[in-house]
């Protein structure tokens, strides 16, 4: 019987638009766009200009998709070893590496043209730095160099709300940095929970994730510590009056949920808990940024009436 790797290496099929769409990691990009949109809306005292909203999000989405495609391209040899990633289009032979590289380059160029022409130069520059940071520094070096890869590399993934803010204002302000910091602190418990669930995959691919290098208990303790730190920092938008009581009450509930899962992860040996913690973390970030958005426009509406 042939192994999965042998089956993957001999499979050759033609690419469809769905394969290129998968190359872009659309679910990840959608979550990033949500945070970028919130950054835009919080930066605006009213309704965001349609021009900035449309072209800003389009440019950010194209850059994020380009970074995702580059990640697929550079890690195809590792993806075939991992259960979570072995069905990706390059691994399956649906898209060859040359076409993937061309596709990623086109997305990157289009992103820069759109952001420079229709938004502002600073947004384009920060977006490009983020792309290079993730696709280059993180994927090529950091991911394989240290178990703190997620912590350091998380800065690139945390950038979208800052990019959205700068798209509206043209400059960097403290509230935007707080939004970035929230995602930055959310990233380690999010990915380490997945890394515990997929510990065997990362071992096969020889990627030094924290559970593989320091053990599962050490990782669970770090997840709880980062969750506590995230809990504290998540109140800053309320403290500096960027948001109001709707956000405050929402984030209280969300933090209680995250702390519950972090503590349960630490105290339980059940195999499904790491994945359930990972899944909750996604809902946490989505709902936190949604609460910021709802809070902003409810209080804006109250001021008008």
From Swiss-Prot:
Any one GO CC term of the record: plasma membrane
GO BP of this protein: heme biosynthetic process; heme O biosynthetic process
Subcellular location: Cell inner membrane
UniProt name for this protein: Protoheme IX farnesyltransferase
PROSITE patterns assigned to the protein according to its UniProt record, in alphabetical order: UBIA (PS00943)
GO molecular function: protoheme IX farnesyltransferase activity
Top-level taxon of origin: Bacteria
Reactions listed under catalytic activity: heme b + (2E,6E)-farnesyl diphosphate + H2O = Fe(II)-heme o + diphosphate
Protein topology in the membrane: Multi-pass membrane protein
EC category: transferase
Assigned protein family: Belongs to the UbiA prenyltransferase family. Protoheme IX farnesyltransferase subfamily.
Gene from which this protein is expressed: cyoE
InterPro entries xrefs: Protohaem_IX_farnesylTrfase (IPR006369), UbiA_prenyltransferase (IPR000537), UbiA_prenylTrfase_CS (IPR030470), UbiA_sf (IPR044878)
HAMAP family: CyoE_CtaB
Keywords, in A-Z order: Cell inner membrane, Cell membrane, Heme biosynthesis, Membrane, Transferase, Transmembrane, Transmembrane helix
Keyword set includes Ribosomal protein: no
Extra remark: Carbon 2 of the heme B porphyrin ring is defined according to the Fischer nomenclature.
Record organism: Coxiella burnetii (strain RSA 493 / Nine Mile phase I)
Biological function: Converts heme B (protoheme IX) to heme O by substitution of the vinyl group on carbon 2 of heme B porphyrin ring with a hydroxyethyl farnesyl side group.
EC number: 2.5.1.141
UniProt pathway: Porphyrin-containing compound metabolism; heme O biosynthesis; heme O from protoheme: step 1/1
Main localization, broad class: membrane
Segments passing through the bilayer: 28-48, 52-72, 102-122, 123-143, 150-170, 176-196, 221-241, 243-263, 282-302
